Amino acid sequence: MEKENHEDDGEGLPPELNQIKEQIEKERFLHIKRKFELRYIPSVATHASHHQSFDLNQPAAEDDNGGDNKSLLSRMQNPLRHFSASSDYNSYEDQGYVLDEDQDYALEEDVPLFLDEDVPLLPSVKLPIVEKLPRSITWVFTKSSQLMAESDSVIGKRQIYYLNGEALELSSEEDEEDEEEDEEEIKKEKCEFSEDVDRFIWTVGQDYGLDDLVVRRALAKYLEVDVSDILERYNELKLKNDGTAGEASDLTSKTITTAFQDFADRRHCRRCMIFDCHMHEKYEPESRSSEDKSSLFEDEDRQPCSEHCYLKVRSVTEADHVMDNDNSISNKIVVSDPNNTMWTPVEKDLYLKGIEIFGRNSCDVALNILRGLKTCLEIYNYMREQDQCTMSLDLNKTTQRHNQVTKKVSRKSSRSVRKKSRLRKYARYPPALKKTTSGEAKFYKHYTPCTCKSKCGQQCPCLTHENCCEKYCGCSKDCNNRFGGCNCAIGQCTNRQCPCFAANRECDPDLCRSCPLSCGDGTLGETPVQIQCKNMQFLLQTNKKILIGKSDVHGWGAFTWDSLKKNEYLGEYTGELITHDEANERGRIEDRIGSSYLFTLNDQLEIDARRKGNEFKFLNHSARPNCYAKLMIVRGDQRIGLFAERAIEEGEELFFDYCYGPEHADWSRGREPRKTGASKRSKEARPAR
């Protein structure tokens, strides 16, 4: 405590007022000093004596079990046993007091002003320096990448970032001038019209028309806008009203059930199998009719779905009717009498819906729509009865092929036939796979399902973007650009002999014949998990366990929990899917703070794991990495996976090469970041191996 010196403050006051002022200050100082002595000095002395007695009574030897004492002070190498203090409490100048020598301060006699003289004076203990934890940013965990919400965009908004504990705004004079010019241009170009004005323009246009120059000038003068703005607004209202009228007429012409089904079909995503999908909303084509879907299902290499499957009955019937003196097989199929099977109206509606969804495939309709109501054979007979005159079944092609197979086919020739058919299917690669099969690097473009009616031509967006047609496309199954999957043995899709692996694609259970998807142990007849396909890591989400800790390189880092083998899958790099313009705007901040979470995905999208992502966002950059990033195609979507570059030991920190070049940020190459300007700093996936 220090007595306030106000000698200079009283120069302008009369002597009487100055004397009163000094008296009040002395009384106030004395009151504070006595209060401190009565309240705080006794507590300090009591606290010190308590710790002294506690320290003297604590044994520094062993506990009851003969081990070391588990108390905190006994486990410290240099325990803080005593308080270091000065016994000269009368020296107020050492404590910061400035007392007036002329003033007599009365002190309480029973108040101790110093500690016990038996307390030894020990040097102060200096606590060790503990490094602070690296600075972290709050983020949201997500298993898969998600499209950025429009409200999360930073384009045209003020951005605040923190550097060395100081909040800075990311803006420059040039940016502010450009924003002001853009705002002025928007104000000049765009005119807002209220509902009443829209109604007025629409009524005048419908009653009198806007072709007359007098009418247009009158409206422009009355509304105080340009004639071009009025014409533009009238055209917008015309399109809007015509579209509303068309939708209303469509709804009135349909029943409520049909309208609801059409709406559900438009809102259902066939890639995510959910309604109102925000991931593929603007990339999803319209669903095809049942006539187009009929060509998707073939009888080649199909297995019977149940004991009452028409395929099983056909095979038994054909085996019983083989004639030794005839080189043909009977075309008859023993089926139940369709007149003995009654179909209710509900079953007929379910049958029609099953044909619309699964096409003319009695097995899928029986298993998914009419399970427990009708057998596969009954559905097949009903389908033949309904389509006998108007449609031909895909089974006819297979039946004709069986009619040409004789009884005396040698074993060697049948083996060669199977081999030729298999080679004929996979020897012709789609045009989009020529770059990857030849070993060259390929930059993927965003996949949008095509809506081709039959086979794809030069106008097909898949061919234009050099992508394969997927099962979600509208083209037929025999399209030359459609990827047909693989036919590898179970668990053997681990090298470039597999077409899916060679094309940097994940096996699809719907396309690959020997890659079923199961979550059981094999007791029910399904494929056990242990022998499932090894090229479905993204679909099965077989991510390795990753730990987050303090990195030896920069900030936080990712460490592996278990040891890993070479080329073993670690996990997927997830985050927000943003456009390149959004990535450039967000990258301006990352160039200044010296960290980047952006990852180039394709020609339209990038992944930003700064706000949303998983533990793989903490992998740091290294010129000698132990991991590598690889772009994979999973059911049409491009996704980024991380794999082991070499054998990785348990607890080792994970690194991968960001593939930064001269055009990227300076901090990525070990130099100080620039204060102004922006640069491209997104990571890029490794080219196809």
Curated annotation (Swiss-Prot):
It comes from the Eukaryota. Residues 428-532 form the CXC domain. Polycomb group (PcG) protein. Catalytic subunit of some PcG multiprotein complex, which methylates 'Lys-27' of histone H3, leading to transcriptional repression of the affected target genes. Required to prevent the proliferation of the central cell of the female gametophyte by repressing target genes before fertilization. After fertilization, it probably also regulates the embryo and endosperm proliferation and anteroposterior organization during seed development. Interacts directly with FIE via its N-terminal domain. These two proteins are probably indirectly associated with FIS2. In plants, PcG complexes are probably composed of a member of the EZ family (CLF or MEA), FIE, and a member of the VEFS family (FIS2, VRN2 or EMF2). Interacts with TAF13. One of its GO terms (molecular function) is sequence-specific DNA binding. Coiled coil: none annotated. Residues 544-659 form the SET domain. CDD domains: SET_EZH. The keyword Transcription applies. Its EC number is 2.1.1.356. Keywords: Developmental protein, Methyltransferase, Nucleus, Repressor, S-adenosyl-L-methionine, Transcription, Transcription regulation, Transferase. The MEA locus is imprinted. Maternal inherited gene is expressed in the ovule (the egg and the central cell), while the paternal inherited gene is silenced in the pollen. After fertilization, only the maternal inherited allele is expressed. The paternal repression is dependent on DDM1 protein, which may methylate the paternal locus, while the maternal inherited allele is allowed by the DME protein, which may antagonize or suppress DDM1 dependent methylation, and activates its transcription. One of its GO terms (cellular component) is nucleus. The gene is MEA. Induction: Maternal MEA allele is activated by DME but repressed by MET1 in the central cell of the female gametophyte, the progenitor of the endosperm. It is an enzyme of class 2 (transferase). Residues 339-389 form the SANT domain. Expressed in unpollinated siliques that contain maturing gametophytes. Not expressed at early stages of floral development during early megagametogenesis. The lineage of its organism: Eukaryota, Viridiplantae, Streptophyta, Embryophyta, Tracheophyta. It catalyses: L-lysyl(27)-[histone H3] + 3 S-adenosyl-L-methionine = N(6),N(6),N(6)-trimethyl-L-lysyl(27)-[histone H3] + 3 S-adenosyl-L-homocysteine + 3 H(+). Residues 1-109 are annotated as: Interaction with FIE. This is Histone-lysine N-methyltransferase MEDEA. Residues 171-184 have a biased composition (Acidic residues). It is found in: Nucleus. Residues 1-20, 51-73, 169-188, 666-689 are annotated as: Disordered. It comes from Arabidopsis thaliana (Mouse-ear cress).
